[in-house]
């Protein structure tokens, strides 16, 4: 029972880290990254479709994204989706491809992005702590199943060690992203 709870804690905490990395990858850092467009969906033949399923997204230059749709009819839908997004990018449509030039970040914009990064990191830490609380509750409920106090205490210590490990990993991910944003 305890091993299952520890395994569940590890899986959930790992998923939180994966979600954090995915969220941070989509944040603008002054250089082109196809992951910036992961959250954007365009209306294509009546359904919302992710941009990476509508065409090829490449990075020909450090601050340029190039979107080559497989169907030229999707160009205007892709352009509208990018304009409606919160990225603040202006697409340039030449009839065959869409170019997105990533503007240089001002100092103020960088600081705002860093604030958002820190907030996202805090949310991930809260999620990790919530997982810890749920797992500790599960362990405490094992008292009813004649599990010894020593085993329960050891399991709680193991859960705390996992929590500390994942919180430390979040801190390193966040500080790396901050350096990336501030050093451009």
Swiss-Prot record:
The protein's name in its UniProt record: Ribosome-recycling factor
* Homology family: Belongs to the RRF family.
Which terms are listed as keywords in the entry?
A: Cytoplasm, Protein biosynthesis
Q: Where in the cell is it found?
A: Cytoplasm
Record-linked NCBIfam families: frr
What is its biological role?
Responsible for the release of ribosomes from messenger RNA at the termination of protein biosynthesis. May increase the efficiency of translation by recycling ribosomes from one round of translation to another.
One GO CC annotation: cytoplasm
Q: What is its main location?
A: cytoplasm
A GO molecular function held by the record: ribosomal large subunit binding
Species: Clostridium botulinum (strain Hall / ATCC 3502 / NCTC 13319 / Type A)
């Amino acid at each position: 029972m305890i091993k299952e709870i520890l395994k569940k804690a590890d899986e959930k905490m790992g998923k939180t880290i994966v979600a954090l990395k995915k969220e941070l990858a989509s944040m603008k850092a002054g250089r082109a990254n196809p992951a910036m467009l992961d959250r954007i969906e365009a209306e294509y033949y009546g359904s919302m479709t992710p941009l990476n399923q509508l065409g090829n997204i490449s990075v020909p230059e450090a601050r340029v994204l190039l979107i080559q749709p497989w169907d030229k009819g999707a160009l205007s839908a892709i352009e509208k989706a990018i304009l409606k997004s919160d990225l603040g990018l202006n697409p340039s449509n030449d009839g065959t491809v869409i170019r997105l030039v990533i503007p240089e970040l001002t100092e103020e914009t960088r600081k705002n992005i860093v604030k958002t990064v820190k907030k996202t990191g805090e949310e991930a830490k809260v999620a990790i702590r919530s997982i810890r609380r749920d797992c500790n509750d599960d362990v405490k409920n094992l008292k009813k199943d004649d599990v010894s106090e020593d085993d329960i205490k050891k399991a709680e210590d193991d859960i705390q060690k996992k929590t500390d490990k994942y919180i430390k990993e979040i801190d390193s991910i966040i500080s790396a992203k901050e350096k990336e944003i501030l050093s451009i």
